[in-house]
Amino acid sequence: MNLLFVCTAHMNRSVTGENLFKDSKKHKAKSAGIGFLCDIKVDEKLVKWADMIFVMNEVDEGQKSFMLEKFKNIPKIKNKIKVLGIRDDYPRDSPELVAELKKKLKKYGIEV
């Protein structure tokens, strides 16, 4: 399954999500950001590639709303996007962030 992890800045959360699956034989993962200055921005090609899209936070950062508006012409976009509810409180690849990601992904049947 192709997994896309999206946060705002593409610095910590989404990159950590991608890193979790770097050695996976079951899943392929990529990451991107929605922010103006991020190095890898989410685009139509990534969205179409993904079977599931995990945004980190809707409440404070509006990531799901951004994705739904920007990519509204992509069929079944609503079904692909899942909100993990992880705030930008963790450094990249920190044990706490890894544990939080694993716990949230498990709810969607994704095991690392």
Say what each PLM segment does.
Residues 45-66:
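Short, structured active-site "lid" loops
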Residues 41-45, 65, 95-99:
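Generic alpha-helical secondary structure signal
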Residues 17-19, 65-69:
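Short amphipathic alpha-helical segments
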